[in-house]
Design a protein with these regions (language model features):
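Hydrophobic alpha-helical segments of integral membrane proteins
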Residues: 7-14, 84, 92, 129, ...
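Residues in the helix-turn-helix
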Residues: 25, 86-87, 128
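Short helix-to-coil transition segments within interhelical loops
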Residues: 69-97
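Short functional hotspots where side chains directly engage DNA or cofactors
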Residues: 87, 132, 149
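Glycine-rich helix-loop "coupling/hinge" segments at transmembrane-helix boundaries
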Residues: 115-143, 176-179
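A cross-kingdom feature marking charged/low-complexity
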Residues: 167-179
Length: 179
């Protein structure tokens, strides 16, 4: 138990490390490693660099509901003869749908806001709404800037709205799971 708890603590520290180190210095180090390995400017690597910052926030959002989940629900299903995978899909995942959707929404919001990883790791080859907003902000036309900023704001708002409404449609016949 002691080794497992120590390993868990080490993994959590590694996951939360990108939040503890200033982003510009952390990403400069990551970029240096990727340039040395010839991996900069690739789409998959850019997605992984966004995940460096998305995963800690999603873990923060999911840790409370996951730890609060009462295992007796899945244990009861297995006692009644259901396989673990079936009890996971039929019981645990539906009960954790709302936290999972909100974790996705938070992760999406964090990813939309990532400017430094997109520029440094993407080697300036990928255009996102955030990189466009930052480049347009240096220009004189505030109308275009406001339109882009509104789009940047609306994307997470749409995902949060979907996270709120999806359980109402998925569980229309289960009142307590619609909350």
């Amino acid at each position: 138990i002691g080794k497992s708890r120590h390993l868990n603590s080490a993994i959590q520290t590694f996951i939360y490390l990108p939040l503890l180190i200033p982003q510009i210095s952390f990403m400069a180090g990551v970029q240096l490693l990727l340039v040395a390995g010839g991996l900069d400017g690739r789409w998959g690597i850019l997605v992984l660099s966004h995940l460096l910052f998305v995963l800690p926030y999603t873990f923060i959002v999911l840790s409370g509901p996951y730890r609060a989940f009462d295992r007796r629900f899945t244990d009861q299903a297995m006692i009644l003869g259901r396989h673990y995978l079936k009890s996971l899909v039929r019981i645990k995942l539906p009960m954790l749908t709302r936290p999972l959707l909100f974790a996705f929404a938070v992760g999406f919001s964090v990813s939309v806001a990532q400017y430094i990883p997109t520029i440094l790791i993407g080697a300036g080859r990928f255009s996102t709404i955030t990189t466009e907003v930052v480049s347009i902000s240096a220009g004189p036309d505030r109308r275009i800037l406001s339109a882009y900023a509104l789009i940047q704001q609306m994307l997470p708002l749409i995902v949060y709205g979907a996270a709120i409404l999806t359980p109402k449609f998925l569980f229309y016949n289960r009142r307590q799971m619609q909350l």
